[in-house]
Amino acid sequence: MGGPLTAAGGRGDGGAKAVEPLRPPPPPDPKTMARWYQLEALERAVRGNTLAFLETGSGKTLIAVMLLRAYAHRVRRPDSRRFAVFLVPTVVLVGQQARVVEQHTDLVVKQFCGEMGVDFWDAATWRSQLEDGEVLVMTPQILLDNLRHSFFRLQDIALLIFDECHHARGNTPYACIFKEFYHPQLNSSASDPLPRIFGMSASLIYSKDLNQHNYSKQISEIENLMNSKVYTVDSESALSEYIPFASTKIVHFDDSNISSELHANILSCLNRLTKKHIEALDRKLHGSSLENAKQRISKLHRTFVYCLYNLGVWLAAKAAEVQSYEENSLSFWGETLDKNVEGFIRNYSEEVHRELSCFLKNGHIGEKFPADSQDGILTPKVHCLIRTLLQYRHMQDLRCIVFVQRVITSIVLEPLLSSIHQMSGWNVKHMAGSRPGLLSQSRKNHTEIVESFRKGKVHIIIATQILEEGLDVPSCNLVIRFDPSATVCSFIQSRGRARMENSDYLLLVGRGDVEAHTNAKKFLASGQIMREESLRLGSISCQPLENTLCEDTYYRVESTPAFDIDKASGTCTLHLPKSSPVQTVNVEGEGSILKETVCLKACQELHAIGALTDSLLPELDVPCDEEPDIVVENKIEQPSYFPEEFVDNWRSFSRLGIYYCYKISLEGCPKTASPTDILLALKCDLGSDFTSSSFKLPGGQDNASVTMKYVGIIHLNQEQVIIARRFQTTILSFLIGDDHLEVSNGIKYFHEMQVPIGVVYLLLPLVSGRIDWCSMKFSSSPIYEANNKHMTHCHSCRDIDLLQTKDGPFCRCILKNSIVCTPHNNIFYVISGFLDLDANSRLPQHDGTVVTYKDYFKTRHGLTLTFENQPLLAGSKHVKVRNFLHNYYYKKEKEPGDRYSVELPPELCRIIMSPVSANNLHIFSYVPSIMFRIQCMLLSVKLKVQLGPTVQQFDVPVLKILEALTTKKCQEEFSQESLETLGDSFLKYVTTRHLFSEYRLQHEGILTKMKKNLISNAALCQLACSSNLVGYIHAEEFNPRDWIIPCLDYDERGNKKISFLAPNGMYSQRKMSIKSKRIADSVEALIGAYLSTAGEKAAFLLMKSLGMNIEFHTEIPVERKISMKAEEFIDVRSLEGMLGYKFNDSLLLLEALTHGSYQTSGPTSCYQRLEFLGDAILDHLFTEYYYSKYPDCTPELLTDLRSASVNNNCYAHAAVKSGLNKHILHSSSELHRKMSYYLGQSFTGPSYGWEAGIGLPKVLGDVIESIAGAIYLDSKCDKEVVWRSMKRLLEPLATPETIEPDPVKGLQEFCDRRSFKITYEKNHVDGVSSVIARVKAGETTYSATKSGPCKLAKKLASKAVLKDLIAGHKDTEAAAV
């Protein structure tokens, strides 16, 4: 053990008098109260990077404070510009640790967290913070972001402290600080000092793996990552003099003995309620609200089932009660519910609470614990918790934490423990995460609870892992693990909370749970194993960090400047990389400082052209119009447009007299006795796009389609308009509505209220080409009014035989071919005629008995039939209106007589409509889908007009525009996906051309960033919003129940369903919530629609009309600064023969083959800019080729074909196969070695698929792209020339028959279908990277290990495992895979 240090960081006499009075007197030196191991750890930390691995409560923070005092002279202002950083994993720890440092040092401490808006601070703001800040306490993400933005430099930090350093793993912010900044600088030749590293943790293992053999490996990994060595003590006994250790005990509970019958009854009850409420949602909600509500009810159901099995009926009921609180408008999954959904969720929870309460016995909980457990009121585990707590009733000043796994468990245990009268003297609180949600708690709530716990006002806290680390919780005399620890770290930290003398740490374990007992023993031994392994590794130096991006090393070549110095003449020439806008710099001067002089001049020239900032840093943000500063929300709420052709004032519409008519014919549907069509009458002509048009109805029967044809104008008087209006209102209300009152109110609403403005058009049934006025006149009359006596007969009937109905006597002719409703069960029926049966006829029952119809209705419905001799009506359920645009396979329904035949007494029926033909019912059931498609087509025509005359000149079919605006979520016969793929490639192609031409001094990296900003989803979304494009997007599946019936466009409260949008002169039906990416996809799909039907000019002008500031020059001129002959460097003739193209400017071919490492005098540019251009050209060429070659392929297949052909591996394979690798100019020995290694293999076969060119250096693929760019420029931007030449190199091309699926995707799909678990593990041993793929399939584990770059090795390993799995599972599905 080392002796105490002498200097604690005090300042000297000189140079500090001006600031000395501003500082308070220094606090007492904490070393005077430090323990021996703390002083020993401090000495180790001063000498080198150290990780202090000590128990919770052993004073690790004090070691950090002493280290800060030791480093005070290095960070104190104004003598030093460096500072110390204290990193903590959670926000709550920022203020906590900052206060500790302030109490024990005289350093200026500043604290930072995300709530301060630090994400939006610029370099100037951070500089102002560092003016006087000496110790900065913050979360690690803030430091990582600042390092990435170069606001901080690692060398400016003198001391870097990591609290809870076990979080340094994977890609956490702790780990990224080391991987991205510390280790690169550690391995570089830079002389800048690195900060001293000090880490603190109570557990070095943060893993679920309890295998003791892996402890050494994990400790070594964290040491290597943090470049530090672990300091710890020999055993717990070395600390026991200073730290009280809890007595760990295992408390057993029995298995649940609740009867299986009771459990089954309760579970059945939950399932029934869940099904009931989900079915209710289908009738009341739609779209995103419906899915949202269904998901939440399903999640709640799983939560209640969890509580039932693990906690008992009482707590399951309590969980339902908590969720039913009205103020709890947020689900505990953290997503805000819309107003329509909140009520359904609360109703569901309330009903679950009522039903579960029925299973609870009367009486106070806890009066008879064994009986409660026996009856399932509480599980044995909960009973064990209560029994255990009651054993500590004698304890004075109880401080207890009960650790649970789930938030809901902590919430419901609080009222349970509070309600037990034996615990009435104890105050119980729960604590869970501060995320938004169920009974959400803020950090202020947490602080108040902990403070009450400290003062003894709260005795028991039921907490999730939030109390394992972070908050400064007082020492406890009792800690109970209700749920087992998930990791070693969790176990050690929760045990560390029991730090009082004679404290207990209790583990609740099932009596027969062997695994839990084994884990508990391993947990107990883990601390000592970690100490022993840490001490054993103490003499082993830290190893360099493994390179996790090893695949890049195969082709990455570091560009270094080259100096040509002539000491005799005093001149120096600096050669910069070929990608630099300045490539050579010449100076004359004094020999001893020639390098410095030429570098200064190079900086001046680079700064002059904007390649360096004023701070002489690379300019990564090029200020230009092409890089807008865009922030777009993930979801955008926009109005959904409605066509103005369908909107008018009903009063004025009925007086027009002249109406434009379109005949709508439904084809491919069942043949009826007298086929009918529909006549659509409108206020205006719809234009040339609707003179004659047709579209399919994939949701109907095979080959169902609609033809729409303009047939001229007709004259209608006001009475005829009213008759037609009544008819369509009645029949459509009946077909769409499923509630008698709803339909009746809708029909009455028509008569009672005149709509000032709304959806206005007429749908007139045709018979033999003529309007069926007879059917409309009588079937739309208000029969439902019982006092309408003149309607007891139809106009031509002489029959005096009246039948008694619910609304009085009616003639047989009225009842035949009518629509009736039976109020006793609220069901609609279509009446086709009369049966030779009456109330006394016999009705066979399912059980074999026979009753009369009179007895049946009396027994079943409590109805007495008084008109026994009336014939029964032959009824059937009416055809349901559904979404016939939905792209699902049509299944032929049974004939009504086979399935829906029913016998109805007339006296139980209320006539809704009569007469109504079966033909009219059938075709009008298609009307909502037909009119919605016409509505969308009208909007597509409107969009064509809105885009302006320059775009309108191109004849793009309306259905093609509609395809571009229809998302996959609509589930229709077409979607925008294929057009989006095509438009995306053209957008990249045009943007790349523009940037390549406009910014000739910028290298490929800057151009790529500019392109990304130009065509990012955020940029495209902003363009769409600015162009008022979003309202045209068809983003949700059509729901016929939401379709507006002409005339009935007010809701039940009298609110309009159609509104006028003054800013853009459009009408809106509703508001929709749409993701910004979906909007961007629609822009790309529109570009694809214009490209595929009208060509490149049309697509480009569309992009311009949307506001894209780009140009599309027919040629891109090439400038030459130096004249040279390409033949002196490459074999031009041989290459031209290989490519099938003769260059006009062979220097372009030379540039395309020149690697950035080639510093020999001659070529002035490397291939990077040409690669940037060629990449976009090839991507577009392949996409266009596959889109036109396979017009009927699915969007998924189009994407797979494109991916299989357009990737660097395929290009690299083609380059080697053709011998292009022999012509590449480079000066990198490393690249030469890698190429030689891989080129020793055989490269034949096709150049497509993921296996083509695997492992080849990236430069080989880059050359294919750069040559494509060179040919494109040389041929004056002729894509056909490029395609012919590149096709020679890349053939044979992928086809739908030859494409090979991605093995990672294939393995995932195979395992998902069987619920197999897949894991991937990366290894790096002796410089060789590998990936192990494992699949747990029942009792069998399949695994494969493959070496190589990470992505490639993962695919190879997946392929091998998938092959073994298929061989081991010889079923039909496996064979298909």
From Swiss-Prot:
The residue ranges of the Dicer dsRNA-binding fold domain are: 534-626
Where is motif DECH box found? 163-166
Record site: Important for activity: K1258
GO cellular component entries: cytoplasm; nucleus
Q: Which InterPro entries match?
A: DEAD/DEAH_box_helicase_dom, Dicer_dimer_sf, Dicer_dimerisation_dom, dsRBD_dom, Helicase_ATP-bd, Helicase_C-like, P-loop_NTPase, PAZ_dom
What are the protein's GO molecular function terms?
Answer: ATP binding; helicase activity; metal ion binding; ribonuclease III activity; RNA binding
Chief place of localization: nucleus
User: Which stretches make up the Helicase ATP-binding domain?
Assistant: 41-222
EC number(s) stated in the UniProt entry for this protein? 3.1.26.-
Q: Where are the transmembrane segments?
A: none
Give the keywords, sorted.
ATP-binding, Endonuclease, Helicase, Hydrolase, Magnesium, Manganese, Metal-binding, Nuclease, Nucleotide-binding, Nucleus, Repeat, RNA-binding, RNA-mediated gene silencing
* Sequence ranges of Gly residues compositional bias: 1-15
Q: Where is the Helicase C-terminal domain?
A: 388-561
Disordered, as annotated region: 1-30
Q: Please state what class of enzyme this protein is.
A: hydrolase
Which sites bind Mg(2+)?
E1171, D1262, E1265
Mind telling me which Pfam families this protein's record contains? DEAD, Dicer_dimer, dsrm, Helicase_C, PAZ, Ribonuclease_3
Q: Which residues bind ATP?
A: L54, E55, T56, G57, S58, G59, K60, T61
Q: Which cofactor does it need?
A: Mg(2+); Mn(2+)
Q: Where in the cell is it found?
A: Nucleus
* CDD domains, A to Z: DEXHc_dicer, PAZ_CAF_like, RIBOc
> Which one GO biological process term can you cite for this protein?
siRNA processing
Q: Which PANTHER family match?
A: DICER-RELATED (PTHR14950), ENDORIBONUCLEASE DICER HOMOLOG 2 (PTHR14950:SF70)
Q: What does this protein do?
A: Probably involved in the RNA silencing pathway. May cleave double-stranded RNA to produce short 21-24 nucleotides (nt) RNAs which target the selective destruction of complementary RNAs.
Query: How does it associate, per the subunit comment?
Result: May interact with ARGONAUTE1 or PINHEAD through their common PAZ domains.
Name this polypeptide is given: Endoribonuclease Dicer homolog 2b
Protein's organism: Oryza sativa subsp. japonica (Rice)
